[in-house]
């Protein structure tokens, strides 16, 4: 899945639209994702991800007119209460941290969004006390965050990251 992002400001409409598109991709590949997770874990991660995406989409009427920071905070709270367990706490931490560092209600460009994600991943890493190579979601999140961060540091356009 590739986010269809221009270099304009991101909005809650962007969050909702992409959550719906991600839901389709995840649902279409659920059995493959479950199989990969069974190789390194207990195979239930896909269900938590699907539940989390569904919760985000259900928030549409509540968050569509909110600032990005308030919308991300609503998402964090919904995920924390709706998923539960370690996945809920970790994904909730990701969105809560992104909400805290977004603090711009006028809009967020892709570089700010990337920095928000990078900070969120770092918070998840600290909370979960996990790193790359430990067969956790950090094996995906950290390399993605590093790649995005490197692209911003090199001042690459989003399409080139």
Predicted regions, residues:
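Generic N-terminal targeting/processing segments that precede catalytic cores or assembly contacts
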Residues: 4-61
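Non-transmembrane, aqueous-exposed alpha-helical and coiled segments at domain scale
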Residues: 5-16, 33, 65-72, 106, ...
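A short glycine/serine-rich beta->alpha loop
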Residues: 36-41, 62-63, 76-86, 126-131
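Conserved phosphate/anionic-ligand binding catalytic regions in large, soluble enzymes, centered on
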Residues: 39-49, 82-95
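Short glycine/serine- and small hydrophobic-enriched flexible loop segments
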Residues: 51-61, 96-104, 143-150
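Phosphate-handling active-site elements
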Residues: 60-71, 100-116, 132, 153
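A structural-propensity feature for long, helix-poor, extended segments
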Residues: 107-152
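Conserved small/polar residues in nucleotide/adenosyl-binding loops
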Residues: 159-161
């Amino acid at each position: 899945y590739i986010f269809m992002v221009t270099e304009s400001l991101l909005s809650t409409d962007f969050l909702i639209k992409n959550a719906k598109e991600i839901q389709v991709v995840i649902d279409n590949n659920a059995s493959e994702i479950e199989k990969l997770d069974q190789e390194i874990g207990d195979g239930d991660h896909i269900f938590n991800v699907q539940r989390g995406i569904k919760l985000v989409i259900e928030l549409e009427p509540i968050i569509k007119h909110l600032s990005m920071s308030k919308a991300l905070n609503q998402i964090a709270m919904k995920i924390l209460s709706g998923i539960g367990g370690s996945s809920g706490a970790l994904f909730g931490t990701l969105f809560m941290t992104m909400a805290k560092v977004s603090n711009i209600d006028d809009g967020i460009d892709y570089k700010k969004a990337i920095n928000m994600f990078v900070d969120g991943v770092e918070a998840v890493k600290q909370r979960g006390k996990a790193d790359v190579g430990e067969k956790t979601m950090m094996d995906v999140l950290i390399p993605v965050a590093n790649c995005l961060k490197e692209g911003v540091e090199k001042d690459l356009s989003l399409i080139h990251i």
